């Protein structure tokens, strides 16, 4: 679809887009036209894992200039409500969010965005790393909510019973290790994804198939020599949530990252009598400056996550590749004059 190049408002910048990662939610909107209560009613531009170059600034923008390379935080509060005042703007019910109906995303040549939510990239951080700040932010927010700290033993639950692509599990491994986790164990159906988990820092991996949740929990405990204090559940699958509860040590924390059906059956009494705290996350907040600092200092390396690259003209092929579950992260290159990472 061809659209006119947008004109930035006083507090906005116009960007020439460079790199946009394909997320599972993009594929879901493409295939099903909705996620929960968010329904696509009009043509919508996808994409929310993105970076680009500033080519024009609004009259009120002073911290950015044309030529600046930036990473885009896709969630922009529309009003200063109670959630914004307490620093949890991700929970604002009126927030703008790229590629969430009815808001357009940034998988396009040119895109305008709030300047306050565009972050300048250091020279040693690539466009692709800038785009990957979005999934990395999910890991940062999840591990902060989980309370990962020095010496933590962490169980990251990936695919189980269903074969789905989960880069989010890998970024949680990266962040947990960076935050000081002593041991991280990962479960998944796929041997190739478990190998990738080892490459990014997982200490142990378990390839699961048709085990019961209790059997998965038992395998985690046997491998670690104890029950983990923290479980990060990345799928939203009922059996995985059950396994997360059974696996987590009494007094520990289970964080739910993956979103599945609205109603699931879980052993809540088992969690209650053992004081296992169950915490949710919704996107992220206040993570872009932290993520940029980690990437610039080389404390975290997200480059291995990108396994496929396509020019924007081959977007359909890129989406089909993601849908088939090939590789880890598929990156679309939106600037025809610069296809570099």
Residues of each region from the PLM?
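Residues in the short beta-alpha loop(s) of Rossmann-like NAD(P)-binding domains
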Residues: 189-190, 260, 284
